[in-house]
């Protein structure tokens, strides 16, 4: 168990095997199967839940492993142990923690400043700001920015194969400029965004460009030493999109600079979301605002509770246990619904 290993004193190093290229890799591949080096267990999913319906073996692989160790007298004791385990919130299938190279934002460098700025925000209830959110800030870790997915904003980072040279692209204009250098150097045949006009903000012009992964991954840039540079394959955490909303909605800094720089539209006077956003939108807004502008992203915030179903579970579309609020209002009226919510909630 990775968590137990990391918490041990001294820390237990991860178990790795060497792949065909001699690189140390985990025992399990990215599909959740044991690697070929694992002999009789190779190709088996580490969790029965990963199999298609009707394909899972009678004994899961962890049971097979336990039996093998006991049979070969290599285990002191084998017993069942009931414990909590993280599941995917979309599929309800078990999650595997997998060691991958990632890009991080060094939030820990501004952790104290984030806490200072949070004390200037008017939280309702105050306990959420000083307690749940405040404690989250005090224990904030560096932000894992990259995601190994297909849909999302691509990391605008191009690197040489040896990783010694890299470039971070900050605008389409800069990307087109670098593509021209790449074409001139012969590492690209053409500028794939040649028809796009810099400075033309019309929809017609932006129909000529596509910045999604399947397109930008075709772009090869050239380093200062003349080496080809490929884009880092990962995407950006979607919470970074949400946290950038105050500036991105105005196409800042390419347009409407005064709205942000002169505080016409920033920071927000008021925002409201559920208490679960202390680790989501509230946090990403605050983190980016602190790092980019040394400012709060919002002055006042109302953090409401969550509506639970009859079994005490949070209502959600995924679980299908939500009550249509408009049908409730139509049947009982707004005042009766308000009174019901207030009288059945903690003060």
Predicted feature locations:
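Non-cofactor substrate-recognition interfaces
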Residues: 1-280, 284-347
């Amino acid at each position: 168990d990775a968590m137990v290993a990391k918490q041990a004193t001294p820390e237990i190093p991860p178990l790795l095997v060497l792949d065909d290229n001699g690189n140390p890799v985990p025992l399990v591949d990215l599909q959740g199967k044991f690697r070929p080096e694992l002999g009789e267990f190779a190709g088996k999913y580490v969790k029965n839940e990963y199999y298609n319906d009707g394909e899972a073996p009678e004994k899961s692989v962890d049971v097979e492993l336990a039996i093998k160790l006991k049979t070969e007298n290599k285990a002191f004791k084998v017993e069942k142990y009931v414990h909590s385990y993280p599941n995917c919130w979309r599929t309800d299938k078990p999650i595997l923690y997998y060691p991958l190279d990632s890009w991080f934002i060094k939030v820990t460098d501004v952790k104290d400043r984030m806490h200072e700025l949070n004390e200037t925000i008017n939280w309702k209830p105050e306990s959420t700001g000083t307690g749940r959110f405040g404690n989250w800030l005090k224990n904030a870790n560096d932000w894992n920015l990259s995601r190994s997915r297909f849909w999302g904003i691509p990391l605008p980072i191009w690197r040489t194969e040896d990783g010694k040279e890299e470039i971070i692209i900050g605008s389409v204009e800069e990307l087109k400029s670098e593509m021209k250098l790449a074409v001139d150097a012969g590492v690209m045949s053409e500028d794939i965004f040649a028809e796009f006009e810099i400075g033309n903000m019309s929809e017609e012009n932006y129909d000529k460009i596509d910045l999604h992964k399947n397109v930008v991954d075709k772009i090869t840039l050239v380093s200062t030493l003349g080496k080809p540079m490929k884009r880092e394959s990962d995407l950006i955490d979607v919470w970074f999109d949400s946290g950038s909303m105050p500036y991105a909605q105005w196409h800042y800094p390419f347009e409407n600079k005064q709205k942000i720089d002169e505080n016409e539209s920033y920071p927000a006077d008021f925002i409201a979301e559920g208490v679960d956003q202390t680790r989501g939108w509230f946090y990403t807004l605050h983190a980016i605002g602190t790092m980019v502008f040394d400012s709060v992203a919002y002055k006042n915030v109302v953090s409401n509770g969550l509506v639970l179903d009859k079994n005490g579970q949070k209502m959600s579309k995924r679980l299908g246990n939500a009550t249509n609020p408009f049908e409730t209002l139509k049947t009982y009226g707004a005042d009766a619904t308000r009174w019901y919510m207030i009288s059945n909630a903690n003060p």
